[in-house]
Amino acid sequence: ILKSVAIKEIHHRVKNNLQTIASLLRLQTRRTDSEETRQVLGESMNRILSIASTHELLAQSGVDEVMLGEVILNIKNNTMRYFSNPKCYVTITMEGGDFQVDSDIATSVAIIINELLQNSLKYAFQDRSSGEIRIVVEQGKLYSSIQVSDNGGGFDVANTEGNRLGLSIVQTLVKDKLRGNLEIESGPEGTCARFDF
């Protein structure tokens, strides 16, 4: 019981500290006139909140594991809240299994999903009035996978991978933290990113 209380307390404190940092970034965002600065601070704030929401779930559970579906749902809701575009109606659907993962995997997946959703919402649906994003989770015996796909305009993967911070973060987390593989395919019919862990 003491271990459970300690785990809850640690995750609760981490969540509160991260939310304080996000609040400071929000204040900073309000003080700038630069749209580019506002966008960069907003992206950073969303990254921090994705980690904070995972720690909130971990604090509620009292163990160092959490249901992956809950993590993804939180990230989806946060991302839609901060990156909604009144000129473009985007739906995000989730499919597949739900299973427990430890805190390290949960945090890495939260950041990865956040980055992939941000990229789709920022770039995929430019000059469009609607779009769809699908998140598919597959639990395997040795490896599990997550696929995030959109029906947007696509992009040149070969000439973009090193130029976008979000994709660099995704590549690093999949390789170094999850010890998995990342595949990105993109064309005029949309983009699909798939990673395993």
Tell where the protein language model's regions lie, with residue ranges:
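Short beta-strand/loop element within the Bergerat-fold HATPase_c
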Residues: 130-142
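Short beta-to-alpha transition helix within the HATPase_c
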Residues: 42-49, 53, 57, 64-82, ...
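Hydrophobic core positions in the C-terminal catalytic ATP-binding module
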Residues: 133, 191-197
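Conserved short strand/loop->alpha-helix "switch" segment adjacent to the catalytic nucleotide/phosphoryl-transfer site
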Residues: 1-11, 33, 66, 83-115, ...
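Short acidic helix/loop segment immediately C-terminal to the autophosphorylated histidine
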Residues: 25-39, 62
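Conserved phosphoacceptor histidine of two-component systems
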Residues: 8-19, 23, 27
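ATP phosphate-binding glycine-rich loop and adjacent ATP-lid/helix-beta elements
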Residues: 157-185
